[in-house]
């Protein structure tokens, strides 16, 4: 998608998309969890991703600068593999707001990738995140009855189950646009760049 500077500001973030196989497993996990947690707002499977860096609202002309800034990372960063497993919540079980499934595996390489992205974008005016990066896929958002949801999660044993969904291959980075509608956030891929490949993709 070619962007023009006349467009209004865009709400964007960098993330890793899920494979079709992993997305199907997420759908099945959400289906199973719905039986115990009918009161939460489930994220649409096509919207689930691994966020690397949230940029917020930027002028459309800034998008190409962002892609140029991460070009050295794209050409030198080796792909890595994560294991998607283990349920958890933010901020805590007493009143959870987010239900997620976590990532294990090559976390040190992932943290290094995120750190490199932070460093590349800071000169453009994007400050590093204050909170430590915690890799996860958001499965559901809890807006009402969150203390009840916390009780269900505590007594059901769901958080103790491994819930291993398989591998997430981090071999490309996608710049997404986020638009909020009455149906929730809708994400549009603006550009996807493969890792460790020579040549311009901007």
Predicted regions and their residues:
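Histidine-dependent nucleotide/RNA phosphoesterase domain, centered on the 2H-phosphoesterase fold
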Residues: 1-202
